[in-house]
Amino acid sequence: MITKLSHTSFFVSDQNKAYEFYVNKLGFKVNTDATMENGFRWLTVTPPDQPDLEIVLFPAAGSNGFEEEVNKALNFLLEKGVMGAALFILWTAVLLMKN
């Protein structure tokens, strides 16, 4: 049984916009904001009331981070009134939310 979560990842289309939203609008704290020699940016934030939870804001691959067919499936479910869809990719469950 999982009783506590210490790390999770959000794939974001723009890390600067994600920073603006999570830090400046929601009041999250920045844990790490470092750019590696290869240009990869490692950006993690923590909710103000959960200092033990670290969220990695990963840059999404491509235009939005999802393959076209996955987006079609998600849109189909959203059109049916589903707010989020759990998709299982290999052994990993990913919760996709779109508004």
Model segments located where?
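Vicinal oxygen chelate
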Residues: 1-4, 9-10, 13-16, 33-34, 41-44, 62-99, ...
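Core segments of cupin and vicinal oxygen chelate
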Residues: 10-62
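A generic structural signal for ordered alpha-helices
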Residues: 6, 23-24, 74
